[in-house]
């Protein structure tokens, strides 16, 4: 049986911590194949080029998606997310993942989730239903609504996902993976 291809998009050092252990488990499985896609701040020198940390941890990215158009304005962010979605569409078309695994609530992860959803790639979301109290919280809830499998970190978060109308059989209270 061919291994199932699990794409993981990682965009920043903070969320990398959430998926690192899971990525090691995917790599150890004979039934799964890791397809690591690196984007966002990982690729920027001004944020420490944290892609180097990923490589030092033993991972080989299947793809890198440069996305930033420059600037930190709302317009620049919106344009950058559009660039990311175009790049991810090409990568997903090439890799043909069976599932996209994402974590957190950053805009880059929302763009990845939207792209996968429109390409009929099922999405699993680590940290569904958490609260942050800022714009990223809205992104997290949008990611949750687009995801097919929900992996909240606690029962309160799982309850929020259920209250959003998600089917209970799709919700797995797994705790925080880091």
Set out the residue ranges of the language-model regions.
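Structural motif
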Residues: 9, 37, 102-104, 126
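N-terminal subdomain of nucleotide-sugar transferases
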Residues: 1-42
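Active-site-proximal region of nucleotide-activated glycan assembly enzymes
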Residues: 121-178
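PLP-dependent amino-acid enzyme catalytic core
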Residues: 2-3, 27-29, 60-63, 75-95, ...
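An aromatic- and histidine-rich active-site surface loop
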Residues: 101-118
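Conserved nucleotide-sugar phosphate-binding/catalytic loop shared by glycosyltransferases and other
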Residues: 33-77, 87
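Short N-terminal targeting/anchoring amphipathic segment
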Residues: 90-106
């Amino acid at each position: 049986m061919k291994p199932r291809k699990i794409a993981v998009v990682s965009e920043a050092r903070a969320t990398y911590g959430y998926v690192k252990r899971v990525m090691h488990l995917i790599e150890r499985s004979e039934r799964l194949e890791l397809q690591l896609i690196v984007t966002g701040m990982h690729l920027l020198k001004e944020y420490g080029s944290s892609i180097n940390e990923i490589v030092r941890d033993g991972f080989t990215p299947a793809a890198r998606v440069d996305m930033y158009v420059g600037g930190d304005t709302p317009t620049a962010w919106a344009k950058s997310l559009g660039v990311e979605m175009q790049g991810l569409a090409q990568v997903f078309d090439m890799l043909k993942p069976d599932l996209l695994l994402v974590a957190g609530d950053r805009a880059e992860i929302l763009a990845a989730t939207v792209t996968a959803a429109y390409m009929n790639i099922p999405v699993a979301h680590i940290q569904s239903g958490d609260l942050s109290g800022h714009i990223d919280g809205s992104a997290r809830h949008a990611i949750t609504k687009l995801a097919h499998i929900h992996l909240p970190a606690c029962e309160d978060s799982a309850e929020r996902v259920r209250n959003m109308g998600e089917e209970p059989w799709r919700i797995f209270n797994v705790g925080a993976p880091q």
